[in-house]
Amino acid sequence: MTANSEFNKRRLENIKRNNELLKKLNLAGIPARIRSEAGIEDHRKASGGAVKKKQGKAPVKREAKPAPIPTRRSRRLRGEAADVEGEAGAGSDTAQNVKQEEEWKELKEARVVGDIKLSDLIKSEDDGELLEKFRRYADKSFSGGDFFEELQRHQKPNPEVQRLREEMRLQQYDVFDPKELAIVHERVTALCFHPSQEKKLIVGGDTAGTVGLWNVADENPDPEHPDSVPDITRFKLFSRNVSKIEVFPTDSSKILAASYDGALRSIDMQSLKSDELLHFQNEHGDTLGISDCQFSYDSPNVVMLTTLGGEFAQRDLRTKPDTMNIMRLSDKKIGCMAIDPSRPYSVATASLDRTLRIWDLRKTVAKPDWSQYEDYASHEVVSTYNSRLSVSAVSYAPIDHTLVCNGYDNTVRLFNARADLPSELQPDFTIQHNCKSGRWVSVLKARFKLNMDVFAIANMKRAIDIYTSRGEQLSHLETSTVPAVVSWHPMQNWIVGGNNSGKVFLFTDAPQE
């Protein structure tokens, strides 16, 4: 009981001390002031009862209210009508701008359908001038047969390396500065050197689906006006990357172009028309993006295709597209393919699944054990090389049956691709090479010259390197940027490389006059 009394005594003393402290701080009137500023009337005043003033309390000094800060409120909350001609009209303009942006985006991504005239895509030039410009390339005398006659003259072993180095001592084109040679607008993804030997023509494609044709001038076309510009014609044929450009083997006036949007189109330079040869789809109507294509050596009317999803097909241009037989050669993207010139039924593929495979197109496998899919049959795998990282490219030498590949492991590997291939390929030569590209540079791909056993590949240190089929370096052609995509002229010692801004670098075997 005594302990309880002591506790109550201390509690009362604490209460008294706290009350005295509150009086000294003048905090007694704060609750009433808060209610007053909030607009809440004291219930005692509302009821008419008198409020007794306690004795001994100091009067509370009221402070002036701060000016209210303006806040944003909608007209609906304020109960006001909307200004139909003002703000409503502004909202309509905003909606119209959004609609126009959506329509423009849809238009940029729209796929070109059907047969068209190229002059309809080029508004800056006259139809007659365009026809006259490219009619000189409509020389139908050039064909695959002429190419094979050239090969027959090179059926002997390679000349000594020193002579090849002299042949590959190429000079950079200097009539125009490379900064002016924008063959396309975006990053170059495909290049083709037209086989004409009298006049140089280079065709390129970019990531936006634009195709450009550069009519190369060997000297300044107008010496009195040094500020003249290169003769480049561009038109947008596709909605996605241009993956491959080739010249028809039976008609050099026609160009074949393929794209990631699944389209395969021809470009006729004699009539300046583009025909749609194929819109690659599966049985469900899904578009199959074309990653690479090549004309068959057996039949110049047959085009072999690979896709971004690992499919493979052969398209006979004389038949309807729905007659194609789709096969599966990989579960992932096939980035590059190559047909063996000595065995046209043999095809090599480079895939994102880190393999280089050689296939026999004469044999079919209903359910390949290497695939996780059961949608398509496959061809028989003859030989395989397993890489540490993805394989970017494959290419066959025209004479000595060498197969070259390069990938993201910064190596170039050379294989003996003669008959009786082992099931597991092993490279004869391995070259350490800076060929791993990044996000903003097109994939670097080694390409053999079509009439010699030499190949070229871009170097991430801004150059084009040329090697023999035994890995002996012949040339190092320096450039100001990375010429990621390269293309040889099929007959002459001319080579071109394209960079990530649409510009090209041309090298020839004689200095410009």
From Swiss-Prot:
- Molecular function per GO: DNA binding
Protein's UniProt keywords contain DNA damage: yes
Residue windows of the WD repeats: 183-224, 237-277, 329-369, 386-425, 438-477, 478-513
Alphabetical GO CC annotations of the entry are: chromatin; cytoplasm; nuclear periphery; nucleus
Give the GO biological process terms.
DNA damage response; regulation of DNA damage checkpoint
Residue segments, region Disordered: 35-103
Pfam families reported for this sequence: WD40
Q: Which InterPro entries match?
A: WD40/YVTN_repeat-like_dom_sf (IPR015943), WD40_repeat_CS (IPR019775), WD40_repeat_dom_sf (IPR036322), WD40_rpt (IPR001680), WD_repeat_DNA-damage-binding (IPR050853)
Which residue intervals are annotated with compositional bias (Basic and acidic residues) in the record? 35-45
Kindly give the PROSITE patterns that the UniProt entry links to this protein: WD_REPEATS_1 (PS00678), WD_REPEATS_2 (PS50082), WD_REPEATS_REGION (PS50294)
Which keywords describe this protein according to UniProt? DNA damage, DNA-binding, Repeat, WD repeat
* Purpose: DNA-binding protein that binds to both single- and double-stranded DNA. Binds preferentially to UV-damaged DNA. May be involved in DNA-metabolic processes.
Give the UniProt family note.
Belongs to the WD repeat DDB2/WDR76 family.
> What name is this protein filed under?
DNA damage-binding protein CMR1
